[in-house]
Amino acid sequence: MSRTLASVRGLAGLALLGLGLVGFKTETAVVGSPVADFRLRDVNNKTVALADFKGAKGFIVVFTCNHCPFAKLYTARLNALSRKYQPLGVPLLAINSMDTVVYADESFRNMQLRAQIEKFTFPYLHDARQTVGRNFRAEHTPQTYVIWRENQQWKIKYSGAVDDNGVVPAQVKNPYVARAVDELLAGQPVTTPQTDSFGCAIFFRKQL
């Protein structure tokens, strides 16, 4: 583990443990596994599905939320990733799978307000039934996946953190998501297909 990532984790733990929110990835969807299409409502009250993006080569899928301090640290970086890669055929989709019963801040209305205030350049989708989060086995916010079109299927090519420094963007040494997308666009295998994610734990309601 790099010293920077260790220090970031330490800061995250101190800042978030008191809220019962901190968590680190223990198990997630397997890199290389297929991803089924989904259809979710965005903050503009439109339904969005992978199939809607004709000609997309892949997607950056980010599980995020409204209240998490770590998720808020990445807003500008997610906007930048969207601006850079959507024109190249790799849109970014942000998904909120947080339980609105546990966290009132995660209401759809608050999602709309956050997207407006922070000027999201990407769709912000409400996973009201938490189905998509479960399918990806997402555990934290922010947690990212790069999925790519392969043999008529969407497959996970990267899973983990956006980069290696949540606190100080200028000190990022490993832009994991950007590097993975660049390698895939160049027709190369992803050199780092999986990393640890860190942030606030996603609480899933018990399935009936």
Task: Tell where the protein language model's regions lie, with residue ranges.
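Bacterial N-terminal signal peptides that target proteins for export
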Residues: 1-12
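Bacterial N-terminal signal peptides
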Residues: 10-20
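Structural microenvironment flanking redox-active thiols in thiol-disulfide oxidoreductases
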Residues: 72-117, 128-135
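Short, internal strand/loop/helix patches
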Residues: 112-156
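Short, thiol/selenol-centered motifs that function as redox-active sites or metal-ligating centers
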Residues: 65-74, 144, 200-203
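Loop/turn elements at helix/coil->beta-strand transitions in domains of secreted/extracellular proteins
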Residues: 56-59, 88-92, 119-123, 141
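Short active-site neighborhood of thiol/selenol oxidoreductases, capturing the structured segment around
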Residues: 51-72, 181
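Non-globular targeting/processing and membrane-anchoring segments
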Residues: 23-55, 161-208
